[in-house]
Amino acid sequence: MSEEKIIGKGTWIDKLASELLEREKKLGRSLDVINVESGLGASGIPHIGSLGDAVRAYGVKLALENLGYKSELIAYSDDLDGLRKIPEGMEKFGLEEHIGKPVSLIPDPYGTHDSYGMHMSSILLDGLDKVGIKYEFRRAKDTYNQGLLKNQIHTILENSTKIGDKISELVGQEKYQKYLPYFQFVKNAIDFTQQKQQNTLQIRKLSNTIVMIQK
């Protein structure tokens, strides 16, 4: 009976790192530096699950390094996400007028950072610093303003039907079969929300917000 080969330190993270390496080799990508990313939700107050996502990503980075590869953890703030709802305990700040706006364009209600989104991200970054996780911080706002993803966005839009079908196949989400995987930033918009219990239609004017585009 042959012994099963132990990868790295024998953990599931080591196995994941090994599978990642095999995938990158098959795709012919450079292995000079392998970036691992953890998204930082910037629309709400971070919690233990938010920290857990970053810790697991950091574990993959360490496993890759243990296998002899250089790796970096990117802590990526999704600060172009729209504010979906008011976080519990923050009702007093009058954030209702900012619902739907990218959180990077909402003023920080505490006045300590350049935006609401940066304030929320900073809370999680402080946690990463305290537990000794090394990372490179990036923001969606800067990434898009600098046009760093324009080629990737073009490719995604060209293949939106294929991508929508694959998302539906893998996770059962059918939204992107009807809508483009793209959120348009608009200066002015109107939101129609049907109130089923009252059988009424609520109409709100929105400014500097993001909307989905139907195919």
Model features per residue range: what roles?
Residues 70-71, 108-111, 122, 129-140, ...:
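Short secondary-structure capping/junction motifs at helix and strand boundaries
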